[in-house]
């Protein structure tokens, strides 16, 4: 995983499995795939993104790994929860997320020039929209074509 990327389901399975000190064969056996080479191969395929487990199997994997199934779910999450998991992924993937208290508020410090530049551009566009220097259509056009 590159800095700032989010983890896919397979990467999350691998992260938690390793964190739990579990071998692929062990996880395969716990979820009913058998503990031999076939089970290990299936888990490897899930972790490497070659196959995606269906929701019922994701439930079994979540139970075996002792985690909330929402962490592995491919179903829609709320925007806020998507952001939470994205921040967790960034933190694991080498883009440290610092939490700072300032004036009684908790703030995120992503300590990344790309985000600083982006936030400045976005703040300027929002100010331009508010002052009617640009139209709502111009603002939407900027957002959907943003390249960083």
Q: What do these predicted ranges mean?
A:
Residues 1-20:
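A short, Lys/Arg-rich alpha-helix, primarily the initiator
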Residues 18, 32-33, 48-50, 77:
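Residue-level detection of the helix-turn-helix DNA-binding "recognition helix"
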Residues 21-45:
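Short alpha-helical DNA-recognition segment
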Residues 52, 56-130:
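Charged, helix-prone or intrinsically disordered regulatory segments positioned adjacent to compact structured domains
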Residues 133-136:
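Charged, low-complexity interaction regions
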């Amino acid at each position: 995983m590159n800095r700032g990327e989010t983890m896919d389901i397979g990467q999350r399975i691998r992260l938690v499995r390793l964190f739990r000190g579990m071998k692929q064969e062990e996880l395969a056996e716990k979820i009913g795939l058998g503990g031999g080479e076939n089970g290990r191969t299936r888990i490897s395929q899930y972790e490497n993104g070659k196959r995606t487990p269906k929701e019922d199997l994701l439930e079994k994997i979540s139970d075996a790994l002792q985690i909330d199934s929402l962490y592995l779910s491919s179903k829609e999450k709320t925007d806020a929860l998507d952001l939470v998991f994205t921040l967790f992924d960034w933190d694991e993937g080498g883009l440290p997320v610092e939490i700072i208290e300032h004036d009684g508020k908790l703030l995120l410090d992503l300590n990344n020039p790309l985000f600083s530049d982006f936030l400045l551009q976005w703040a300027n566009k929002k100010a331009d929209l508010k002052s009617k220097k640009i139209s709502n259509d111009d603002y939407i056009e900027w957002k959907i074509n943003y390249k960083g």
